[in-house]
Amino acid sequence: MPYEKGPELSGARLEEADFSNARLHAANFEGAKITDAWFYNADISGDLEGLRLNGVEVAPLVAAARARLFPELTQLQAADPQGLAEAWAMIEARWQATVSRARELSEATLNDRVDDEWSFVETLRHLILATDCWLRRMVKGIDRPYHPWGLAGSWLSDPGAWGLEAGANPSLDEVLEVRRARMDEVQHTIAALTSEELERVCVPPDAPGHPNREHTVLACLHVILNEEWEHHRYAVRDLAVLEGN
């Protein structure tokens, strides 16, 4: 079942609301307070900073558990050129293996969504956009950094303002060609880094796009690495379902 645009509930007070089996996507719970709730067999993902469950700060516990489950996460927080190069090499190797695995399936299957999440092809298109946002717009300062096939979430109400084609339907090979070029850009940028360059503050161009505030080069690269790692995890998860079908 596709998602519907949700109601504006900022400041609302709800009692005895039944959300059993509900699906909430891109929901903002900043400052929300939920009491006397039942979270049996619930699945929550997202940013958890400041979240408390029964009086306990959750984020540090989740971070520690994820570090045990995924030891490679420490690589993604590298703060020097060599460490970043090693982290990116790990990302590239994982995606190369996963794309080879995905090619065993039909292209139609790779455009199928699992549980209404992005398809494999859509995931690759989103990562093109992520690179355009954080590398081309921020680190390189390009005014119009976006490839038209980049894919944003529902939060972007006017993709055309960024130069994105909302109705684009490129083939897997076409997407992979753009994706390869973007990954090469990341690799070349990291290879040329110095420790001083990592501390440089990037000012976003005065043009439509995201982000809209300053970040260091290191912070931008950390976002790219985390986007790549998280979406690779989702892609592998969904490929397993598609293979089973």
Model-derived segments and spans:
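Alpha-helical packing segments of well-folded alpha/beta enzyme cores
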Residues: 87-98, 130, 134, 171, ...
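Proline-centered turn/helix-capping motifs that create local helix->coil transitions or kinks
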Residues: 143-144, 187-199
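Short, contiguous alpha-helical
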Residues: 107-162, 184, 201-245
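Tandem repeat scaffolds
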Residues: 1-68
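Amphipathic alpha-helical repeat elements characteristic of tetratricopeptide repeat
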Residues: 78-81, 85, 92, 117, ...
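Long, well-ordered alpha-helical segments
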Residues: 97-106
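Short, helix-capping/interhelical loops that line the mouth of catalytic, cofactor-
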Residues: 57, 61-87, 135-183, 242-245
